[in-house]
């Protein structure tokens, strides 16, 4: 969250709400009935963590309200009734979700005006693709989607959505580590695994080859220190975890990988504009931050596309926040302020 016109968000925190697992016995300790974001993260050992957004759709509106309240009053320290608000959502989200979001903003927070933008379109803004043409693969915590955009317009019938993203990768890593005898089961422990994934995971250019390397040498092994001081070593897990993006069948999902879904989305478009889309594949979102993902994506799409086609995968360094940055650009345009 932040202010229009800024080049980076002022506040970045996980959208989690934590409630104490046990009732407080010591009076006057200032215990709260709910903690949000970083505070929930730091006290996670005594809390049960809830994720009010699942697969890009808000599933618990009371908790969403807490998160927005925390954003306005604690993080940005603004009075919402004095500021128009730009919110974002995943494409193909249910209409009821947007309506409820609008209702809370106007009725609970009394905002003077609001606008809901599609995340992938904002990423294209942020990537500086001024032609407004390209295909965006936006993969966050709960959902990945492929959005072909032509001259600034998202093409709805060619949007493909994949309910596979960061949280599924974290769960997959938890499962792999459990096979090795490490127990990560609670919601708090899941956050430890997420941190491990973000710090150590990478995408292999050739998965089978990488497995061979992992078997024959310890060159890819890395240590990770748990909060209690215990050190665990992870090797093949580092690339097995994000491989799920390219092979969802590894976690039992009957879906095509992100490379195939990108290709399918391009193929749904007219022959005339496919060339522009192949030459402008833009990655965005936290789950595209794995080292090696752009090279692998390029390799896989080159194998699927016609041999004469020029493929270009763009992975802007700030892509973790490119949706927010695009929102900052859009919200500061005078044309939007007139709406």
From Swiss-Prot:
Its main location: cytoplasm. InterPro entries: Actin, Actin/actin-like_CS, Actin_CS, ATPase_NBD. Coiled coil: none annotated. Disulfide bonds: none annotated. Its EC number is 3.6.4.-. It comes from the Eukaryota. Belongs to the actin family. There are at least 7 different actin genes in tobacco. Actins are highly conserved proteins that are involved in various types of cell motility and are ubiquitously expressed in all eukaryotic cells. Essential component of cell cytoskeleton; plays an important role in cytoplasmic streaming, cell shape determination, cell division, organelle movement and extension growth. This is Actin-54. It comes from Nicotiana tabacum.
């Amino acid at each position: 969250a932040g202010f229009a016109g800024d080049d980076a968000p002022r506040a970045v925190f996980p959208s989690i709400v934590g409630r104490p697992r046990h009732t407080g016995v010591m009076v006057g300790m200032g215990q709260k009935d709910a903690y949000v974001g970083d505070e929930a993260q730091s006290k996670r050992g005594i809390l049960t963590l809830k994720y009010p957004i699942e697969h890009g759709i808000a599933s618990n509106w009371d908790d969403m309200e807490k998160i927005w309240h925390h954003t306005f009053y604690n993080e940005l320290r603004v009075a919402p009734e004095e500021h128009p608000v730009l919110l974002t959502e995943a494409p193909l989200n249910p209409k009821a979700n947007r309506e409820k979001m609008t209702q809370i903003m106007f009725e609970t927070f009394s905002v003077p005006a609001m606008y809901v933008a599609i995340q992938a379109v904002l990423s294209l803004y942020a990537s500086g693709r001024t032609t407004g043409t390209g295909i965006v693969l936006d993969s966050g915590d709960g959902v990945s989607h492929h959005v072909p955009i032509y001259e600034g317009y998202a093409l709805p019938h060619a949007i493909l959505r994949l309910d596979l993203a960061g949280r599924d990768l974290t769960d997959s890593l938890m499962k792999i580590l459990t096979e090795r005898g490490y127990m990560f089961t609670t919601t708090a422990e899941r956050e430890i695994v997420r941190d491990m994934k973000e710090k150590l995971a990478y995408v292999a250019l050739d998965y089978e080859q990488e497995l061979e390397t992992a078997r024959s040498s310890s060159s890819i092994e890395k240590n990770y220190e748990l909060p209690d001081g215990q050190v665990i070593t992870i090797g093949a897990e580092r690339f097995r975890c994000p491989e799920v993006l390219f092979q969802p069948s590894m976690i039992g999902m009957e879906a095509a990988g992100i490379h195939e879904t990108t290709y399918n989305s391009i193929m749904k478009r007219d022959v005339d504009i496919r060339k522009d889309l192949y030459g402008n594949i833009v990655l965005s979102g936290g789950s595209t931050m794995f080292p090696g993902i752009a090279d692998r994506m390029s390799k896989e799409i080159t194998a699927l596309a016609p041999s004469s086609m020029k493929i270009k995968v763009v992975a802007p360094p700030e892509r973790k926040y490119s949706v927010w940055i695009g929102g900052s650009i859009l919200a500061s345009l005078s044309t939007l302020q007139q709406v």
